[in-house]
Amino acid sequence: MTYSLQMPRFSISQITTFAAPFADDVRAYAAAGADGIGIWEIKLREGGDGEALEQLQASGLESAAAVPAVPSILPLPLMEGPPEPAARIDAICASLHRLAPFRPSGVVCLTGPGSDRDTVVDGLRTIADEAAGIGLEVGLEPINRVGGEDWTMISSIPEAVELLDDVGRPALGIQFDTWHLWNTPTVLEDVERHVDRFVGVHVADWREPTRNWADRVLPGDGVADLPAILAALDRAGWNGLYDLEIFSDNGAFGNAWPDSLWDLDPDELARRGRDAFERVWAARIQRDVDRVSPGAL
């Protein structure tokens, strides 16, 4: 088994500090020692893209996977956007051009729920072609099978690969997410087999029992075997950013959890997130050795 001896590059997705404005996110993440930021288009105020880009460049942060304002081809619950797939595809393509100056590692895209695969395939081709024309990649994100019927038609890496192969566009890859895929029976094997198709990695842990999709916890605070997943990514050669993505509803999506991480100060949450990731990263070697040779270390 071969492992990186250095800390990987760590970033924080802006949804993690949901209520903070763009400038506060950049400052808090840089102060916490993060290497990058995952930009959400909803954090860019109208007419403020130039200022946001200057703030990003001055911070020295890299740009991880970005999330467009309309993130899926088919409509999603609780998220705004037109109901017609064609209009949603146009919106995603427009977002690609808006996000391109920030040079994200990829732009996240979901299928949306339902069974209209032909519309999704055609839409992904259009989106991938638009991305390729401006030097971007698109990351198709599988969504957790627990409650995923409201969000997606793919819930595993093999299902994503099959859809990618149907689309047949080199600018389309996979956005891996530990929260969504930790309970896939073959996740470790899937990571090692298909890591070369990943354009981004989201990291969060699974609360048990979980209360809904916006109830994620920091790495190490849940039941997902994150050390094993990070070890698999490390062995497979993933060298991109590990992007912390926390949804923790404080009432914004209808549930005001009393222990919502979104209620924390952005600086505190960024520091805690960084520390939590580093602890889980350090645990990956012990966990992987125990998996193949219990008690060897």
What are these model-predicted stretches?
Residues 44-62, 93-100, 121-132, 186-196, ...:
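Short amphipathic alpha-helices and their capping/turn segments at secondary-structure boundaries
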Residues 2-3, 78-173, 183, 263-269, ...:
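Active-site acidic/histidine proton-transfer and metal-coordination neighborhood
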Residues 26-47, 67-72, 108:
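N-terminal substrate-binding region of glycoside hydrolase catalytic domains
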Residues 2-13, 65-78:
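N-terminal small/glycine-rich loop or linker at the start of catalytic domains
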Residues 2-11, 16-33, 94, 103, ...:
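Histidine-acidic metal/acid-base catalytic patches
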Residues 35-36, 62, 105, 137, ...:
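Residue-level detector of anion-binding/catalytic polar loops
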Residues 16-22, 39-51, 73-76, 113-119, ...:
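Acidic-and-aromatic substrate-binding clefts and catalytic sites of carbohydrate-active enzymes
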Residues 38, 65-67, 108, 139, ...:
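Conserved beta-strand positions in the central sheet of alpha/beta enzyme cores
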